[in-house]
């Protein structure tokens, strides 16, 4: 798969799924629901699921069901629904392993400056989606992208996921989306992570899911190429990032509104 496959229509494309793979049956159900919705609306779709959630606040936080088991779930989704898959990697040693199962390797925001990680991802030949660090300016993302390109891979996407605002909040500066687009790469808005409220005293990240629709609509209005959203059948029992996820039952209604906005641009 190449980026051109995601841009084959005038619509935005979507990266969506649970934060982390919690089990095969649930992941398959979520994928099935989203495939039916995106097919109906004509939205190019990539299933998102982390096989390991390494960035957690506490040692006792859930990180996954085991790398091999979770990667096999991702491969099953890929084969069952004939859709591309995106997953996060956290070290250079994970790149080649994950690339055997997925189509897009995602670089977490906190790791977007890690040269060895970016180069290892580039060398797989997969699409590399780099999330903008909460501490970086939009323009500074060209240096992260350049590392991948100079390593021989021009299949790069950039993702806006909010900027640190004080100690326990993030904001989206929508001016950064067209600024990053001038770098020559597709730009994605990570709607749900942009609504996180990090560094809470309980050691569990908070969120403002009631603003998901607002942030997503604004992203489409400014011309973002794709959207990233984490979704779950019941966010209240999700094992990671439930506080800022979109309930799966709300996805079709939201995407329908977003497609209408896109059509008038």
Task: For the regions a language model picked out, list residue spans one by one.
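N-terminal amphipathic alpha-helix/helix-capping segment at the start of soluble metabolic enzymes
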Residues: 1-15, 72, 263-265
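Catalytic alpha/beta core domains of metabolic enzymes, predominantly
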Residues: 7, 125, 129-231
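Glycine-rich, proline-tolerant flexible connector loops at the mouths of alpha/beta enzymes
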Residues: 14-27, 45-67, 231-241
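Conserved beta-strand positions in the central sheet of alpha/beta enzyme cores
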Residues: 15, 46-48, 86, 106, ...
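Active-site mouth loops of central-metabolism enzymes
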Residues: 16-29, 57-65, 83-88, 107-109, ...
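Alpha-helix-loop-beta-strand connector modules within alpha/beta enzyme cores
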Residues: 33-41, 60-86, 121-127, 177-187, ...
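Catalytic beta/alpha-barrel core
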Residues: 65-66, 80-94, 103-116, 127-138, ...
């Amino acid at each position: 798969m190449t980026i051109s496959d995601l841009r084959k229509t005038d619509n935005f494309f979507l990266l969506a799924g649970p934060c982390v793979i919690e089990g095969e049956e649930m992941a398959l159900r979520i994928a099935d629901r989203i495939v039916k919705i995106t097919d109906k609306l004509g939205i190019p779709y990539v299933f998102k699921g982390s096989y390991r959630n390494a960035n957690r606040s506490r040692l006792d936080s859930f990180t996954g069901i085991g790398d091999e088991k979770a990667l096999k779930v991702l491969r099953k989704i890929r084969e069952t629904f004939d859709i591309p898959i995106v997953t996060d990697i956290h070290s250079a040693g994970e790149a080649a392993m994950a690339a055997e199962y997925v189509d897009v390797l995602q670089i977490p925001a906190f790791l977007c400056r890690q040269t060895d990680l970016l180069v290892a991802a580039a060398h797989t030949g997969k699409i590399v989606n780099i999330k903008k660090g909460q501490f970086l300016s939009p323009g500074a993302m060209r240096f992260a992208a350049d590392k991948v390109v100079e390593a021989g891979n021009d299949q790069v996407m950039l993702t806006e996921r909010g900027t640190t605002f004080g100690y326990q909040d993030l904001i989206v500066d929508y001016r950064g989306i067209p600024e990053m687009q001038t770098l020559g790469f597709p730009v994605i808005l990570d709607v749900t992570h942009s609504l996180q409220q990090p560094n809470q005293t309980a050691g569990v990240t908070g969120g403002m899911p009631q603003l998901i629709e607002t942030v997503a609509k604004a992203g489409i209005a400014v011309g973002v190429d794709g959207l990233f959203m984490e979704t779950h059948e019941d966010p209240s029992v999700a094992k990671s990032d439930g506080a800022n996820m979109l309930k799966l039952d709300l996805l079709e209604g939201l995407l329908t509104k977003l497609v209408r906005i896109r059509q008038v641009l």
